[in-house]
Amino acid sequence: QILKRDQVNYVPHLDVEHKDAESLILPSAVAVVGVRGEDIQYRFGYEANRLFHLSYIDEGFCVFYDLKRWVGDADRLEEVVDREGHRSFVPRKEIIRAYLEYVIECARQRFKCSFKSIHISAPVKQKPLFVELFQELLPEYRLESENMLDEGVAVLYNTISTLIKEKQYQDGAIYRALIIDCGAGTTDLSSCRFRITD
């Protein structure tokens, strides 16, 4: 069984630019590979990066990065162009939705299960905006909003999880952390103390 109860479970992604090496990080990149009227075909993550690098050799790929920056202006239209020159205009939120659905589908395939609830971290100052948009984009899921982690705290929890997993902590010792979260045009700085007990 791939899905392990009471543990952090990761979805590895194949980095097609590095001989299909597994990576736990997926680039927030979306490439447009087909435009047929309202029907837009996308590629995501490493495949989008690969197509972006090909576009320097073979013009015609439309690739988007920094999707998180779009949350504040999600209704804005983006022009999409495929390799054959077909064009259309798509709201940014539709591109974001396609990316999120891809990420969820990767997890569904990996763990062979369906999801009813999801948690998406967000920049601390933009949580309400992210919650509102993601609830609109993914109405079929219950989005954790009341206890939604900001991105900096999510990174800290991941670090604590690694300390526990690798037994790299002293039981009961007080640790201090400085969290510097840079992204999407803002930098958040916070500090905390925490203790791990068995």
Give a label for each model feature:
Residues Q1, I40-Y42, L129-F130, Y157-N158, ...:
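Short helix/loop capping segments that flank catalytic or ligand/cofactor-binding pockets
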Residues Q1-D6, L163-D198:
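Gly/Thr-rich phosphate-binding beta-strand-loop-beta motif of the actin/hexokinase/Hsp70
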Residues D6-A122, K127-E132, L137:
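Phosphate-binding loop and its immediate beta->loop->alpha context
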Residues V32-R36, G72-D82, A154-E166, S191-D198:
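Short regulatory "switch" loops immediately downstream of catalytic or recognition motifs
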Residues V71, A122-Q126, G152-L156, D181-T186, ...:
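Short, flexible loop/turn elements at secondary-structure junctions
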Residues E105-S114, V124, F130, F134-R176, ...:
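Hydrophobic, small-residue-rich alpha-helical packing segments that form membrane-like cores
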Residues H119-I120, L137-L138, S145, R193-T197:
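Amphipathic alpha-helical scaffolding segments
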